[in-house]
Amino acid sequence: MIKYSLILLAVLLIIFWIFTSYLLKRGEAPVADGSTNYAIVLGAKVNKGSVPSRALKYRLDAAYDYAMKYPHTQLILSGGQGDDEDATESSVMKKYLMDRGVSEFQLIEENESTSTFTNIKYSMKSIPLTEKKVTIISNDFHLARAQMIADYFHLEADVVAAPTPKIIEFKVRVRERFGLIAQKIVLWFK
């Protein structure tokens, strides 16, 4: 009996892994083509000294490239201040992008959010009600859940997938698999 239980558990874990792998990969599409007027850049950890973490830097580099290619797009820099952060994620993002040459007029700060859900919820305050399409910029592992949340708020989202730093890739991809399922359950009950 124990042997069959272990086999069943192994099969269920394999199915879970394959299913969530599919969801994570599907989150990287559709690729943004500049057809939106607003792009939400999702915040991430800010290190001591108001230095963007590597994951945040990769997101910002992708946002910079997108802003240069599509200068009509307003970037909504979304992220509040965590207990262990010196500044809001949005202010660190704004400084980083302005230092690289992005116009301040192209940047909108959203500095209250503390989760992916509130990143998108609070960023919507900066988007006119007539806009139903938005671009989301984040690390590749994060986009499936971000799109799930955008869909909850009736936004059609295309994406810019920043790479995930190799040093954290395994950890965040495992965590995100459970995050996807948990987020879906939470959204069912909202």
Pin down the residues of each PLM region.
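N-terminal membrane-anchoring alpha-helices
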Residues: 1-35, 186
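A structural signal for short, hydrophobic/glycine-enriched beta-strand patches
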Residues: 21-174
